[in-house]
């Protein structure tokens, strides 16, 4: 299994428009963060996790091949605002999109023309699949277990993906998690989880909270995503973090 971080930034991206802070003026490519999204690939299956407004830019450097499914974590624009840009991939067939009921409703409201009885030629051909926590499913050779985390008071989905010996857990926008959900993460080999900044935030984990959560899960390697400009510069933050818990960066490829 191969994991590509297409975007590792928060809803405003980094640099933030109009900002001249220490992070935003950095010339290090690792400090340029598009909105969160990831590509997960095996020899036979290709999945996208979230499809934000930077999708077109993110996918241009990737081979043009079928996308077998899109997993949506929640119904916020920075995680599904790029869905209209999947239309070139519809030449391979309908795009299967998997989301919880609230995100499915948001998709219908955001892209009503994709679900009309008589669709305009060329609009994305999307097949929505309503999924729920703890109800596993399979796409190709990847087994997927959705579980629930809390984005402040909004229940959203995390995903555990397994294929052969590869075992990846992906979480974004989490603030808290019910202890009962931890059973669904037990034994995972790689954790991807959000770390917004150092100061407390009402709906996202801080860096310290993410580190504590990583220790609780106990995965051999953890990558931190959904980071804002307030987190500081990539290299300096990583130098202060344990070697097994590091900030991810846009374009990073991990072989599992």
Spans of features found by a protein language model:
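Binuclear metal-dependent hydrolase catalytic cores
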Residues: 1-171, 180, 237-249, 253-255
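Cap/insert and terminal regions of metallo-dependent hydrolase folds
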Residues: 175-255
């Amino acid at each position: 299994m191969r994991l590509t971080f297409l975007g590792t930034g928060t809803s405003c991206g980094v640099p933030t428009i109009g900002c001249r802070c220490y992070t935003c003026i950095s010339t290090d490519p690792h400090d340029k963060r598009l909105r969160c999204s990831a590509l997960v690939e095996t020899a036979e299956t290709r999945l996208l996790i979230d499809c934000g407004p930077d999708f077109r830019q993110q996918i241009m450097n990737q081979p043009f091949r079928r996308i077998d499914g899109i997993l949506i974590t929640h119904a916020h624009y920075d995680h599904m605002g790029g869905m209209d840009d999947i239309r070139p991939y519809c030449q391979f067939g309908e795009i299967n999109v998997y989301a919880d009921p609230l995100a499915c409703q948001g998709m219908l409201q955001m892209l009503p023309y994709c679900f009309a009885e008589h669709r305009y030629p060329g609009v994305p051909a999307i097949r929505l699949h309503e999924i729920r926590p703890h109800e596993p499913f399979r796409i190709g050779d990847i087994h997927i277990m959705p579980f629930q985390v809390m984005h402040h008071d909004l229940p959203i989905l995390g995903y555990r993906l397994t294929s052969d010996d590869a075992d990846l857990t992906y979480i974004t926008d989490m603030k808290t998690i019910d202890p009962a959900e931890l059973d669904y993460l037990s034994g995972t080999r790689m954790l991807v989880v959000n770390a917004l900044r150092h100061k407390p935030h009402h709906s996202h984990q801080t860096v310290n909270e993410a580190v504590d959560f990583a220790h609780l899960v106990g995965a051999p390697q953890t990558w931190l995503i959904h980071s804002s400009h307030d987190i500081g510069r990539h290299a300096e933050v990583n130098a202060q973090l344990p070697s097994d818990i590091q900030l991810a960066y846009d374009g990073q490829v991990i072989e599992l």
